[in-house]
Every structure is written in structure tokens, then in C-alpha cells.
Amino acid sequence: ITGKEGKVKYTNNSNFFVLGPSGSGKSFFMNSVMRQYYEQDTDVVIVDTGDSYEGICNYFEGTYISYSKEKPISMNPFKITELEYEENFGEKKNFLKSLVFQLFKGTDYPTKIEDTIINQTITEYYEAYFHPFEKFSTKERSQLKEMLLLEDKKNGKYDQYEQEMEERYDRIMEEKETSSRNARLIDKLQAVLDDTAATEGEKKAALHQLQRLTPELIEKNYLLRIERKIDKMERQRKNLRVQELSFNSYYEFALERIPQLIVQQNIEFAIHDFAAILKPFYRGGEQEHILNNDLDASLFDEKFIVFEIDKVKDDPILFPLIVLIIMDVFTQKMRIKKGRKCLVIEEAWKAIATPVMANYIKYLYKTARKHWAMVGVVTQEIQDITSSPIVKEAIVNNSDVFMLLDQSKFKDKFSEIKATLALTENDCQKIFTINGLDNKEGRSPFKEVFIKRGLVGDVFGVEEPPECYMAYTTEKQEKEALKFYKRRLGSDYRTAIETFVSDWHLSGIQKSLEFSQKVLKERKVFNYKQSS
């Protein structure tokens, strides 16, 4: 499944894409894949929206985190160490930009100005924390001076100042002719013009020199203005302090810094909209806990983690946000842990399949390979892969392993899937044999799956013992019956499964669902004994 078989390497990466319509056995198959990965010493992180992995997570004594209003999933994606800042800040910054724009813009793409400003605030925010600003260097002041002068020449402020100075000079000259009281306002060069002892040639030369020096004097005076402006910018930067890293402190920093940038760069940015939209996640807001609480550090040591976020899947703001910060947790885990890592995103991936997220998804997929990690996306709707360019460009194109379950429901529309996944005619022929061959005799119940690794694709049967079936099941009554056994036995999940399966077989009941219904009806653990 990972693209390798012994020493044979079929793929360039282990990222995978799974397509299986409802009823095709997708959940059972994915549980089987996760079991195999875990038993091969892989750290597993799953984002789910339907309790499909609750049983196997309990079996492996993993961590099952289910979102609720009483116990929401909360993290602090803004918190990083100095080492992370020095070594991986570029990647972290891109993630935080995606996060901020997910909050601010939703599915809308940010403008160039918005991207530039948010990028600058994030950069300066971390500089203020790790390397607090004191003053501009001589080189920085010189560059700022040139930039600000050029900016004012571009926007007409310099021309306006120059015109005002020239008008002021002309006004003084006119007043000189009509009133001797203004003679004191004229500079040394103008005094030459007033000197009755001066010859006409000297007066003419003085007037010519005055006219020649005026632009230089104007620019020199204007540069003094710019120096004062830089002094103010320096004071503003120095006053921007960050004491701790969190969304709260970033929000405060951004709301102080962005208005300064708007004035300095003469740009437009919807600062009031920005402040209002992000405010619910700030201190005292309805969602203040989401981005300001430190993540339980023990999660980085857990080998099997399931985030169950079904309760928030209909929230257009929280759903993509939570998926995004879980992906960031995996990214951190990916760097910290040395062994193989796997992130599986079930239907929740649709929350982030937006233009704003496209670059981050591509980055995650490409980075996974460098850190012995893989990302898998699981879906059941054909439209999910045929109607979204984000899926094709960011997910499919960066996945070398495709897994398709029974596609008979999609037979009339399969040409679109074939084109999107670049399947061959031979692949398609194999796919439409899934669960259709006469190969069931002498085997326990199973379903089939087509797995393509690189250019090589084949159909495989998914056969598991009844103990695994009970760990994987998503049938509500079977899950409830198993939980009942666990409570009554006071045992761990494995013992409960072993006892349940033993009783099921010894009961003579063929189907696990029928036995589960019997357990729930009679409310007891049967403890059947094997007859000698």
C-alpha cells in the first residue's frame, strides 16, 4: 500500500487517495489499512466525521478526541520554539497565513495587498517576540529615506510640497515689492537683490543662483521631514512588544500595526472588517479557546490519534479551521517523530479544498515525503474528485497510490474518474471485476479493492478475522453490544472483543448483528463455554 514491496519501489511518494461509494466497504477497508500501518510501527493521525475509527482506536488504546461545545478541540498554532523559528519559519508563516485568511476571507482568495500585509504582520510579530526591535540601522534608515521619498514623489506629495514652497517664495517676493516689513524674511541671497550698492550683474547672478538652489533646498528640507517620519516609525515599531505567542497577542499586534502600514504605504486594507471578523477568536469572544490554549504535549508521543469532528461539520467557520489546525499538529509531529507517520483525512478534507488552502495542501503533500510521512484522503462522492480543480492539482497529482472500492454505482460516469486519476483501459477492466468474480467459495466473507501503486494496479481481497471485524464495525448495535461487554467485564477493549467473539461463535448465531441484538435485549454477558 505504501508503494513499496520488499526492495521493489513502485512510487515516488506514499500519499494515497481512496474512493469508495456508500456501502462499498470503505470504512472496513480503511480500518484494515490503519491496523496494518500501526502494526508496522507507524504513527497514525485520523480526522474523521462519523466515528468510523472509534473501535480500532480503543483496541490500540489510542487517543480519541471528539469535538463538543463542552469539550472543544483547542490548540495554539502561533506558539513555536526559537529553534523552529530559526529553522522552519518560512513554512510556519505560510501555514499561519492560510489560517488567518481562512478566518478572514473564508473561501475567497486574498488580494495581493492583503497577502502582503498579513505576511508582513506575521513576520514582524515573531521578530518582536524573538528579536525585539530597538532601532533602524544606518543602512535601513537610508533605504527607508529613499523609499519614502520615492513614494511621495510617486503619489504627488513631494510635488505638492515643492509647489507650496515655490508659491511661498513667489508670495514673499510680491510682498517685498509692496511692503518693507517683509524684507526681514528674505534669506542672504535675496539680501543681495536688496543691496543698492550691488551692480545689475551681481543682482542678476544672485537671482540666478537663488533660482538654481531652490529645488535643492526644497529636497533637503523635505528629507528632514522624512527623517522625522522615520523617527516616528521607529518609535511605533519599538512600542510593539509581544510577551507571549498566541492568537490573542497576534490579534493585538495586527490591529496596532496594520493601521500604521496603511498610512506609511498609502494603501487600502479593510482593517475594521478584519478586526470584526477575527474578534470572536480573541479574548472574551465566543471562540476564544480555539486558538489560544496550548496543545497537550503528550499527543506528540501518542501513536494512534483520532480527531472526531462530526459535531462541527456543518459550521462553515469552525470546520475548516479545526481541520487546518489538526493538519498543523500532524506537521509538527511529522518533524518531531523519527519513524513513519500517516495522516488520514476522511470527508473532512472538503472543508479545506478551497483556493486559499491549495498552496498549503500542496506544501503538506510534498513535505510529507521528506519526513517519511504520508497523507491519505478518503471520499465517497464522485463529484468530489471530478468537480474540484483543487482536488486534482493539490491532492490527486501529489498522490502516487490510488485505492478504489466497488465502482459499479459510477459505471455510467466513470470516464470522468478515469481521466482525473489517469487510469488505463486495463485498470478500468480490473476495477469493474471488483466483487463480481466467482471466487467466494471456501473463504470467509470479504470485499475487494483495486490498489494502484505508480503504474501497477491489481484487485485485492480484504479478509479479516471476526475480532478485527468487531474492532472495525460502524454498525451502531454491534458497537453498543461490544461496549456493554466491556463495561460488564470491567476489562480492556481487547479482552471484551475476544470474549464477545467467542460467545458469538458458541451461540450458534451466524451474524454478528443478530448476536448483538440478543446481547442488547437480554442485557448480559453470556460467557459460553467450549464443549469438550
Set out the residue ranges of the language-model regions.
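Conserved P-loop NTPase motor cores
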Residues: 3-36, 41-53, 61-72, 310-430, ...
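Sequence-level motif detector for i,i+2 pairs with an aromatic at +2
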Residues: 13, 301-304, 446, 457
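Residues in well-ordered beta-strands of folded domains
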Residues: 1-2, 19, 76, 308, ...
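P-loop NTPase motor core of the ASCE superfamily
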Residues: 86-139, 389-532
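P-loop NTPase motor domains
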Residues: 1, 7, 54-63, 69-71, ...
